[in-house]
Design a protein with these regions (language model features):
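Accessory nucleic-acid engagement/destabilization modules that flank
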Residues: 2-205
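Conserved helicase motor
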Residues: 10-15, 275, 296-309, 456-459, ...
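C-terminal helicase lobe and adjacent C-terminal extensions/tails of nucleic-acid helicase motors
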Residues: 96, 381, 439-446, 454, ...
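Walker A/P-loop
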Residues: 234-256
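Conserved Walker A/P-loop ATP-binding site and its immediately adjacent core
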Residues: 256, 265-289, 301, 397
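Inter-Walker segment of RecA-like/P-loop motor cores
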Residues: 290-339
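Interdomain hinge/linker at the junction between the two RecA-like core domains of SF2 helicases
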Residues: 387, 393-446
Length: 727
């Protein structure tokens, strides 16, 4: 009888010519399939044996009468993960056992032997083994013995934590893919071209740039050549320090593709600080490499996924695990995934192994998380065969941290002639004017036909904008929804091109990745990196003389928001004795000062300490860190604005049409506000909240009084309580 006994992993209903039947996936087929895939994925970092065993044993707990009853007769829920974890534990490979235990519920905190039975840690849950809570395995299911060398957990280790998360990623992606193959048949995955093909396309585009005529284009060509020749160097950690306007987007792509092909690497990943930069870079890459080879993955992207009608979007599928030749994503998405514990977020991690990863605008990494960010970069290079390129015009000083987290890799500069290029690309003259009253500032701005003024706070930006004449004046800040900002930017570009008056007052959002070109820029005193980013919007194409392209640095009479305090302090020290703001040496001094002022606060929540020493008596606090590590403090709330097309999307939301795609589209019509501003709007009766609309959570609302959203300046701060809200 035992010979006929069948154990199933999954079932799926099939309708053939109106006749309903059920198809079954054998448990042994599923475990074998997952084992094979997981082995393949883990091979990228030499962990193929562990990958295979994790896959072959992850669903052992389905070989129980209780689980089969659940699957076939809709019986009660059953813990099917602990049994496989227990089997892996027999080889004393406890962290791999934790991967198996968390393959649905997330990688748990490891805990300690003192944890009571049933605690939500690995050690607490494994104690349930042998109690009635965990059904006994059916002796008729042939479970293969675990063949693994011992890997006991004796002490905490940061590198082991990264390795565990990588193995977890291999397991959950393999599990998703094998299950998907059974449930839905073959899906359009891995559809991009080879990196060799992409390199050929890039070469064809670059050949059009041969024989440059202008001085600037000759310099860009030299930088490009330096990138191509450096690509033959070994894998490791590189910096690419190129002045603004030096063509770093294309040059870094040339390095990445040449390097990846040279070393047989799997993909290229771009990590950028803002979604606004992503959209721009992604357009450049798509133009060169073809739309199907470029995956954008961030909160603002929408996929056309028509899976109900059997037409899954290959890009939506690729976004689940980054199985694409070129991925472009945000620093938030990237680093939060590196410290995540949920299967959906960790799925993609194994595809970072053996990849070229470009960190664009590397100076934008938040200082309070600098250490865990560099630790993640170090681990990818040191343990997982990746190459990292820190790419910026203002290189932060990271040597000491790189040495700590990637001790066998020294940083190497791709384009070593740094001072020479910075001199050649000098397109502006800096002028420091001290304190300016807002009225005096407005007068100065009015004296220019075309000028950009960047202010630290959203409130001050609105106030200064209100002092300018209506004709030809524009305002940009994050109090305007993204779709609105895009419309205004198009108007600004048109007026600049047509030589019409165009005065813009903006917050710092224009500093990175917005390619507008002004003859004059005013920048309120801020971090030196911000000032240089602002300067990059002045005489961008070098069509005017540097001495006629003035970047004016000023202070306002009102104190800057506290957020800017340390950066301004470091800038004051770095610019002492009339130092040249644009020289790489001044920049280095600035980052040294900033690190000094910040002291030990470069790991705000103690991520490194938690994995090197344990936390709260628990070794390997995967879940605790995942829940607490946020690149951007979410002390803001979302207000959806019924502006233009946003109104129809909000109607759909209120009618209950909730879907991922709808929330993504709504992101284009949302403003983030601080709690006090949210409360003031609520008190003024201007918000519809979760109490009235099920589709909202307690951190979001809909603006129902459109008189508070201005066509020029966005969401009004009039309802506020006098506090500075800054963006």
């Amino acid at each position: 009888i035992a010979m006929d006994k069948k154990f199933y992993a999954h079932t799926r209903p099939i309708n053939e010519n109106g006749v309903e039947r059920t198809e079954y996936q054998l448990l042994s087929d599923h475990e074998h399939g997952v084992g094979t895939l997981c082995r393949q994925f883990a091979e990228a970092f030499g962990a193929q044996a562990e990958g295979h065993e994790a896959g072959v044993h992850h669903d052992d707990g389905k070989a129980t009468a209780a689980f089969q009853h659940r699957l076939l007769d809709n019986g009660p829920k059953v813990d099917h993960a602990t049994a496989g974890a227990q089997n892996i534990m027999l080889s004393n490979n406890l962290l791999l056992a934790a991967c198996v235990m968390g393959h649905h519920s997330g990688l748990p905190d490891f805990g300690s032997t003192k944890d009571p039975l049933g605690a939500p840690t690995f050690t607490g849950r494994i104690k349930k083994w042998g109690t009635p809570a965990i059904p006994l395995l059916d002796p008729d299911y042939p479970i293969p013995p675990v063949r693994l060398p011992q890997r006991p957990v004796t002490k905490p280790s940061l590198s082991e934590s990264f390795r565990t998360r990588m193995l977890y990623s291999c397991l959950v992606d393999a599990d998703y893919l094998d299950t998907e193959r059974f449930m839905k048949g073959d899906m359009p995955r891995g559809t991009g071209d080879s990196l060799e093909t992409l390199l050929t396309r890039l070469q064809a585009r670059l050949n059009e740039w041969d024989n440059p005529t202008s001085e600037l284009n000759k310099l860009r060509q030299q930088i490009l050549r330096a990138c191509v020749s450096a690509a033959a160097n070994p894998k490791g950690i590189y910096t690419l320090t190129v002045p603004t306007g030096g063509g770093k987007t294309t040059s870094s792509l040339a390095f990445a593709l040449h390097h990846a092909v040279e070393h047989g690497m799997k993909r290229v990943i771009y990590v950028v600080p803002y979604t606004s930069i992503i959209e721009q870079n992604a357009d450049v890459f798509r133009g060169i490499l073809g739309n199907e080879n470029v995956l954008e993955h961030h909160s603002g992207v929408q996929f056309e996924n028509d899976e109900e009608n059997g037409n899954p979007d290959p890009k939506a599928l690729a976004a689940e695990n980054w199985d694409s030749p070129l991925v472009i994503t945000t620093a938030v998405q990237f680093f939060e995934s590196m410290y995540a514990n949920r299967s959906s977020q960790c799925r993609k991690l194994h595809n970072l192994a053996n990849s070229v990863i470009i960190f664009d605008e590397a100076q934008m990494l938040p200082l309070c998380h600098l250490m865990p960010c560099v630790a993640a970069i170090g681990a990818l290079v040191e343990q997982f065969g990746a190459t990292a390129v820190l790419c910026t015009a203002t290189q932060p000083v990271l040597g000491d941290l790189i040495q700590r987290f990637a001790p066998s890799h020294a940083i190497s500069e791709i384009c070593p002639e740094i001072p020479f290029y910075f001199d050649k690309f000098r397109r502006v003259t800096f002028r420091q004017v001290g304190v300016l009253e807002d009225d005096a500032l407005a007068e100065l701005l009015c004296a220019h036909e075309q000028v950009l003024c960047i202010i630290n706070s959203r409130k001050a930006a609105q106030s200064i904008f209100s002092k300018l004449p209506e004709e030809g004046s524009f305002h940009l800040s994050t109090l305007m929804v993204p779709a609105h900002r895009r419309t205004v930017l198009e108007q600004i570009r048109r007026r600049l091109n047509d030589g019409l008056p165009c005065r813009v007052v903006s917050t710092s959002l224009v500093e990175a990745g917005v390619d507008i070109d002004y003859p004059a820029v005013y920048r309120e005193l801020a971090g030196l990196d911000s000032i240089l980013q602002a300067a990059g919007r002045c005489n961008r194409e070098g069509k005017r003389a540097a001495e006629d392209s003035i970047v004016t640095i000023f202070r306002r009479t009102e104190k800057a928001p506290p957020l800017f305090g340390q950066a301004i302090g470091a800038t004051n020290i770095a610019l002492d004795n009339n130092a040249d703001p644009a020289s790489p040496q001044t920049m280095e001094n600035y980052f040294h000062e900033l690190r000094k002022l910040n002291g030990s606060a470069i790991d705000k929540i103690g991520v490194i300490d938690a994995f090197e020493r344990g936390r709260g008596g628990s070794l390997y606090p995967f879940r605790t860190i995942a829940e607490n590590f946020r690149m951007i403090d979410n002390d803001t709330r979302t207000v959806y604005i019924p502006w233009r097309e946003g109104a129809e999307l909000i109607d759909r939301l209120c009618a209950g049409a909730c879907s991922k795609s709808l929330y993504r589209q709504l992101g284009q019509y949302a403003v983030q506000v601080y709690d006090a501003h949210f409360q003031a709007l609520y008190d003024a009766g201007a918000l519809q909240t979760a109490d009235e609309t099920n589709a909202l959570d307690d951190r979001s609302a809909i603006l129902c009084d459109l008189s508070l959203y201005d066509e020029k300046t966005g969401l009004s701060l009039k309802a506020d309580s006098g506090q500075a809200f800054f963006g």
